């Protein structure tokens, strides 16, 4: 509404300026009538007998008017006759047009006067324009003043007791006036003046009200603001304390959960030892897991949970019995929210692939000859570097495989099946058929010499994250565990 009032006021000022300019231009249009010399009389208007047509008609009119006076008789001298009294002529009040091609000194003087008058009018119009701009700036300033005073009035009234606040609508404000009124500037000034008076009255009443009360004056705006600031600081401190407490509880619960999981793993190992007494195999890693046919229910599960890994090396001995139809999935590791956290898979006629967080790298490995092979896969999160070894030889390497993605902890490691969900939903077409032994997992990348020593049985190593032990591997669905010495078995092959 204030913006509309400013627009209307500006339009009214422009309209008044246009009217003043029109009024001021009227003397300029009437100036040719004043071009005639002020001292001219009837004699100069009718002096020449051989003038133009309009002048002849005026002379005739003059002669007709003069015939009413006394005439001079013939034969009498002209000097003896008194001149007749002057008779007012109608031509004195007629607008006699002058010829267009009649140069005279009076016209040149009048042209100079007209130019001066035109310059005067132009300066007057410029002054009116400047006045309009000043009035518009004043309207803007008054609008800002009204906004500031209204805010100050609200703050002051908020500090008054409820009995001092006006219950009804306030008068002498901009809401009572018509925004399209010609007296908009006066209304603005009145509104500003009324707001000033009201603020002064309220500021005077607040100390008086505080002095009349025996208790401390909490109605002062400064006291209210300070109280609100104090409460806000207390609330903020409480919120920060609660946030710290929640963070501490979350951290403590995470540590507690890890400790509980460690204890559970230890208890599971203890229970397995108690159930089986000592290991059925000597040494404990001298066994294999056999999956005789392709299906979706035979598999082996590792009981130990994995920690978060930023690098790993997984090594195993495998013998595929699937022929040339694809080797399936020797192992898969899934976590909550990601079924393909780590997968070693060969599906159909495709080459063997390593999947990490659903990112794929093709490995130049071949296991289709139904013989025992030692394979190792190493990977690091830095730049996603990976390497693939078969029988102690480096077959391929690459980078940008799930770079900077750490392997998530607390997942499920399955031998022989590919997981579509956490710990289940196996697909028979992706199942492994054959034997698996010596599956070990490290939390770092092994050197080529270490890989070669394990492959030729000259430097056997056990995984520091997951060793191949009888008590940590459990067979399900018809998969069988049997005693097996990998070095002797490979020598026989």
Swiss-Prot record:
Pfam families according to UniProt: Pentaxin
One annotated GO molecular function: metal ion binding
Cofactor: Ca(2+)
Glycosylation sites (chain numbering): 42, 211, 456
Record text on cofactor binding: Binds 2 calcium ions per subunit.
Described function: May be involved in mediating uptake of synaptic material during synapse remodeling or in mediating the synaptic clustering of AMPA glutamate receptors at a subset of excitatory synapses.
UniProt-listed Gene3D superfamilies: 2.60.120.200
Stretches in topological domain Extracellular: 24-493
Compositional bias (Low complexity): 57-72
InterPro entries for the chain: ConA-like_dom_sf, Neuronal_Pentraxin_Related, Pentaxin_CS, Pentraxin-related
Membrane topology: Single-pass type II membrane protein
Transmembrane segments: 3-23
Ranges in the topological domain labelled Cytoplasmic: 1-2
GO biological process, one term: neuron projection development
Maturation and modification: Ubiquitinated by a cullin-RING-based BCR (BTB-CUL3-RBX1) E3 ubiquitin-protein ligase complex containing KLHL2.
Binding site for Ca(2+) 2: 418, 420, 430
Name this protein carries in UniProt: Neuronal pentraxin receptor
Organism: Mus musculus
Binding site for Ca(2+) 1: 340, 418-420
């Amino acid at each position: 509404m204030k913006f509309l009032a400013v627009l209307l006021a500006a339009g009214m000022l422009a309209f008044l300026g246009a009217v003043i300019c029109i009024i001021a231009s009227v003397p300029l249009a009437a100036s040719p009538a004043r071009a005639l010399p002020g001292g001219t009389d009837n004699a100069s208007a009718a002096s020449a007998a051989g003038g133009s047509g309009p002048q002849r008609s005026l002379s005739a009119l003059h002669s007709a008017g003069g015939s009413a006076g006394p005439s001079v008789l013939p034969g009498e001298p002209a000097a003896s006759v008194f001149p007749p009294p002057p008779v007012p002529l109608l031509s004195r009040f007629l607008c006699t047009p002058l010829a267009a091609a009649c140069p005279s000194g009076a016209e040149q003087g009048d042209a100079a006067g007209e130019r001066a008058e035109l310059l005067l009018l132009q300066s007057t119009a410029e002054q009116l324009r400047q006045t309009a701009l000043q009035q518009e700036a004043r309207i803007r300033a008054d609008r800002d003043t009204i906004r500031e005073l209204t805010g100050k009035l609200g703050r002051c009234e908020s500090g008054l007791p409820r009995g001092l606040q006006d219950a009804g609508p306030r008068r002498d404000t901009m809401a009572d006036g018509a925004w399209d009124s010609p007296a908009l500037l006066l209304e603005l000034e009145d509104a500003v003046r009324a707001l000033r008076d009201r603020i002064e009255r309220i500021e005077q009443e607040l100390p008086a009200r505080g002095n009349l009360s025996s208790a401390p004056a909490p109605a002062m705006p400064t006291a209210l603001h300070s109280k609100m600031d104090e409460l806000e600081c207390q609330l903020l401190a409480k919120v920060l304390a609660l946030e710290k407490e929640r963070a501490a509880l979350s951290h403590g619960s995470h540590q507690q959960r890890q400790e509980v999981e460690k204890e559970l793993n230890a208890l599971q190992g203890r229970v397995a030892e108690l159930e089986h007494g000592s290991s059925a195999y000597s040494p404990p890693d001298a066994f294999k897991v056999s999956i005789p046919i392709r299906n979706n229910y035979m598999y082996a599960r590792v009981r130990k949970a994995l920690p978060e890994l930023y690098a790993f090396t997984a090594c195993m001995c495998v013998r595929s019995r699937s022929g040339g139809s694809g080797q399936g999935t020797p192992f898969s590791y899934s976590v909550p929210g990601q079924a393909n956290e780590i997968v070693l898979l060969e599906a159909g006629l495709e080459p063997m692939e390593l999947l990490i967080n659903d990112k794929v790298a093709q490995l130049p490995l071949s296991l289709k000859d139904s013989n025992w092979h030692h394979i190792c896969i190493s990977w690091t999160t830095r730049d996603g570097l990976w390497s693939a070894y078969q029988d102690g030889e480096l077959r391929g390497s690459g980078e940008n495989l799930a770079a900077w993605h750490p392997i998530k902890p607390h997942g499920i490691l399955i031998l022989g099946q590919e997981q579509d969900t956490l710990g289940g939903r196996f697909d028979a077409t992706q199942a492994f058929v054959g034997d698996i032994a010596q599956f070990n997992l490290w939390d770092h990348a092994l050197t080529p010499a270490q890989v070669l020593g394990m492959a030729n049985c000259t430097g056997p190593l056990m995984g520091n994250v997951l060793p191949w032990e009888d008590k940590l591997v459990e067979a399900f669905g018809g998969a069988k565990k049997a005693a097996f010495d990998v070095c002797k078995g490979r020598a026989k092959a």
